[in-house]
Amino acid sequence: LGLETVPRGPGRSVQKLELAIDAMDIPSIRPFWKAVLAYTGEPGYDGPTDPLIDPTREGPAVWFQQMDQPRPQRNRIHVDVSVPHDEADSRIASALAAGGTLVSDRRARAFWVLADAEGNEVCVTTWQDRD
């Protein structure tokens, strides 16, 4: 095709970032992540266990890994979704309507902590009220 990888440093080639979310019941959490990220399914692949993509093609793809047993310890990472302050309320409402729960709004206007049905956390953040 005539495409060439242009290194950005020693030994550097192409890098692609994806987010993988472990889940016991993928169809129960996928709608939450679709709503909170404002993502879509790939054309022709929008089933209950299919990956999600950023419709603007700027953010990483999100895919779901089937787990056989729950993991009792707390997640060691979480996702921050930064949105314009005037979109935060509607993004949170969409995520809650899609099965999410509000974990904390103690720092509301700066960020809210939400979780999907299996406890995977995401913070919806804005620039307001930052320290």
Write out the residue ranges for each language-model feature.
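Glyoxalase I/VOC metalloenzyme domain signal
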Residues: 1-45, 53-103, 115-131
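Generic short beta-strand
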Residues: 50, 111-112
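Short, small/polar residue-rich loop motifs at catalytic or cofactor-binding pockets
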Residues: 107-109
